[in-house]
Amino acid sequence: MSLSFELRCVGRCLVLAVALLPQPGNAADASNGSRIAHRWCAACHVVTPAQLRPTTDLAPPFATIAKRPGFDAAKIALFLLDPHPKMPDMSLTRAEAADLAAYIGSLARK
């Protein structure tokens, strides 16, 4: 492979990654993110301060995720589009992933 081919591949990957990020001007809806969290995430994560505990202790509470140094809602949203193997494939849209990430981020203030 030539260097120019490799650079084109890297460039295409970067363009794709940027395209998957939430778009500016389309404000994420944390209240919709809350609904998504209760539907998809509450079985494994504590998704609200009022929730006593999930069915497993393997997944961190959303508030803990939100309070981590360097928390970045855009990175969380991108991760949610292709989660790790232990998480179910929720087939979220970019907007839904951004909403869920906004909701998680809102828990840092609680």
Give residue ranges: language-model regions.
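Post-cleavage N-terminal segment of exported redox proteins
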Residues: M1-A27, T93, A102-K110
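Generic structural signal for beta-strand residues in well-ordered domains
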Residues: L7-C9, L20, S34, T55, ...
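Residue-level detector of functional hotspots within protein domains
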Residues: G11-C13, A27, V46-T48, F71-L78
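Generic signature of intrinsically disordered, low-complexity, basic-rich segments
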Residues: C13-V15, Q23-P24, G33, R39, ...
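Alpha-helix initiation/capping motif
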Residues: N26-D29, Q51, P69, M90
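Periplasmic/extracellular electron-transfer cofactor-ligation site
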Residues: A28-L58, P83-P85, S106-K110
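Extracytoplasmic electron-transfer domains, predominantly the class I c-type cytochrome c fold
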Residues: D57-S106
